[in-house]
């Protein structure tokens, strides 16, 4: 086999992994995720300028070989879609460059890669240029599942629906459903409290699930909280 054929085989064998590392507790990472991390050449870590350390990397690093290469990918904290698209494209280009060299890349994500993750946007860019065999999405335990488990809270039972909202927009429309999960509630907690007072719903506030500073507790509709940590969610169950 000549050197060109060997190089082509190396490139075609390179894989792109979306690795869900769970909510924060290193014990809640899956065996498949550990297998991949132990063999990977490049770890891709999404970070905003505001972040000093990546929580996902803190979870994953104990499972990675000492010589693994870290590729930090800047993801701006903005709602400007043109800026976000440029950042996603830049990240996808860097990942593809590594794969062209024959290196497999693992993109880390808190929780599960398929739920409100930057990985999904990179996937839409890379799927058309990679073969199906070169992509593997490794599921992870979500913060909402871990929070519910911590307090023995059934997310849904029987034929009940479960509604997941990325914020509180349109909350009134969904209050007819028995089970709700509200993500990204940090700045909207006063409105959530107001709605629980109106509807009498049971609520659990979960902050930094599985991480240092974890706080999971029943939310008292009468208390006054203006803002909580960015990594917070609310589980709601209508009475």
Give the residues covered by each predicted segment.
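Gly/Ser/Thr-rich loops at beta-strand to alpha-helix junctions
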Residues: 25, 50-51, 111-118, 141-143, ...
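Glycine-rich, flexible N-terminal cofactor/catalytic loop recognition
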Residues: 6-75, 194, 204, 212-213, ...
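Conserved Motif II region of HX4D acyltransferases
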Residues: 98-120
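A contiguous loop/helix-start segment that scaffolds small-molecule binding in enzyme catalytic cores
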Residues: 16, 174-239
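General beta-strand structural signal in soluble alpha/beta enzymes
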Residues: 45, 72, 107-109, 135-140, ...
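A polyampholytic, Gly/Pro-enriched intrinsically disordered region
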Residues: 90-98, 154-166, 223-233
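Class I SAM-dependent methyltransferase SAM-binding "motif I" and its flanking Rossmann-like core
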Residues: 115-176, 225
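Glycine/small-residue-rich loop that forms an oxyanion/phosphate-binding "nest" at active or ligand-binding sites
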Residues: 71-100, 107
């Amino acid at each position: 086999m000549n050197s060109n054929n060997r190089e082509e085989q190396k490139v075609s064998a390179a894989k792109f992994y979306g690795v869900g590392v769970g909510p924060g507790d290193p014990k809640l990472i899956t065996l498949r995720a550990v297998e991949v991390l132990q063999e990977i050449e490049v770890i891709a870590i999404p970070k905003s300028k505001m972040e000093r350390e990546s929580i996902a990397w803190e979870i994953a690093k104990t499972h990675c070989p000492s010589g693994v290469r870290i590729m930090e990918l800047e993801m701006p904290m903005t709602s400007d879609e043109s800026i976000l698209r440029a950042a996603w494209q830049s990240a996808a280009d860097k990942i593809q460059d590594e794969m062209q060299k024959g290196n497999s890349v693992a993109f880390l994500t808190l929780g599960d890669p398929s739920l409100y993750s930057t990985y999904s946007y990179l996937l839409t860019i890379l799927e058309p240029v990679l073969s199906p065999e070169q992509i593997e999405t490794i599921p992870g335990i979500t913060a909402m599942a871990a929070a519910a488990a911590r307090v023995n809270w059934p997310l849904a039972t029987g034929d009940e629906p479960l509604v997941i909202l990325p914020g509180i927009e349109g909350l009134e429309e969904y209050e007819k459903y028995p089970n709700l999960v509200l993500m990204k509630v940090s700045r909207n907690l006063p409105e959530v409290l107001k709605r629980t007072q109106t509807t009498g719903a049971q609520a659990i506030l979960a902050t930094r699930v599985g991480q240092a500073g974890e706080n999971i507790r029943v939310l008292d509709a009468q208390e006054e909280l203006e803002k909580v940590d960015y990594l917070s969610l609310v589980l709601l169950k209508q009475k």
